Amino acid sequence: MAKEKFERVKPHVNVGTIGHVDHGKTTLTAAISSVLTKTYGGTKRDFAQIDNAPEERERGITINTSHIEYDTPSRHYAHVDCPGHADYVKNMITGAAQMDGAILVVASTDGPMPQTREHILLSRQVGVPFIIVFMNKCDMVDDEELLELVEMEVRELLSEYDFPGDDLPVIQGSALKALEGEPEWEAKILELAEALDTYIPEPERAIDGAFILPIEDVFSIAGRGTVVTGRVERGIIKVGEEVEIVGIKDTTKSTCTGVEMFRKLLDEGRAGENCGVLLRGIKREDVERGQVLAAPGSITPHTTFKSEIYVLSKEEGGRHTPFFKGYRPQFYFRTTDVTGTIELPEGVEMVMPGDNVAMTVTLICPIAMDEGLRFAIREGGRTVGAGVVAEIVA
């Protein structure tokens, strides 16, 4: 019998390790790589390679991140691990590493610590949909009751931030022992992989979502009408379909009468493609950059929202001085800047460069938004911060 054909089309899932400093996130990442490549094949990455995380720049923000890949029989995973706490904050807020699920690492010798809580809060704010817990260093705890106590504590903490603490998987293991090849602890890594496969649902692909295209440019073509151009962010637009133009002004409806790419007429435009969409009955002055073209009813315009933001440090080219309430920067959504005012949390008087903070923003005109939308904060065209919409207020 011929060997089974190598399947390249496995679903792709993005995950990452989160948790308190020195609780074993990087060791666990190395252990997953080691055990899964040993079991299912692939290229192993060792601790030193993962720990020496390369520096990346995302929207001008410097982030150190390690990316590794591994396979289970049913899926392909891309996994991110960050060396420092600040890297996690930046990564999660900018969406540089979008996670379909996170592995929360808690050392059973310590239990939940301040950054454990902070990473759970960040996960809630930025919309990480699923968390699996790996209790690490269980080889160092002899007392079964102590392990139960730590597990209970972690579950309660997750419930506090609206994750299903009672129901989510908690695996008790030892990343170091698994990495050293001890079979009973290697089995725990396979149990974790099984939890990733079963607990995190297959992510919706961009093409399967409701259609949305952030408008970058507007043209008028004599005898044909108005064309808007941009890159389709999600979904598919077909000729003849109804669309809405959302944001900045009142929402208007139109019909797509043509899709073109590189001067060729097409039947449809798909997620990831740059295309022009011809709109029926729309004047050139009715549409502007910064609005979005969307499937009717799929997205609404809003002016006030709660957000989690990271303020660039001076070294990253950000502000040199703090800002206070009443600060009025521009908020850059998708393709345009909109002025807004900020409201800081109670007890917070000022925000320093390099800080992260939750704040409420009120824009001077409405923008099409969903929770989870990323934005930049700018002053005169220079980026001074990055943020994510955590909750829509109005």
UniProtKB/Swiss-Prot annotation:
The keyword Transit peptide does not apply. Keywords: Cytoplasm, Elongation factor, GTP-binding, Hydrolase, Magnesium, Metal-binding, Nucleotide-binding, Protein biosynthesis. Residues 60-64 are annotated as: G2. It comes from the Bacteria. GTP hydrolase that promotes the GTP-dependent binding of aminoacyl-tRNA to the A-site of ribosomes during protein biosynthesis. PANTHER family: ELONGATION FACTOR TU, MITOCHONDRIAL (PTHR43721:SF22), ELONGATION FACTOR TU-RELATED (PTHR43721). This is Elongation factor Tu. The gene is tuf1.
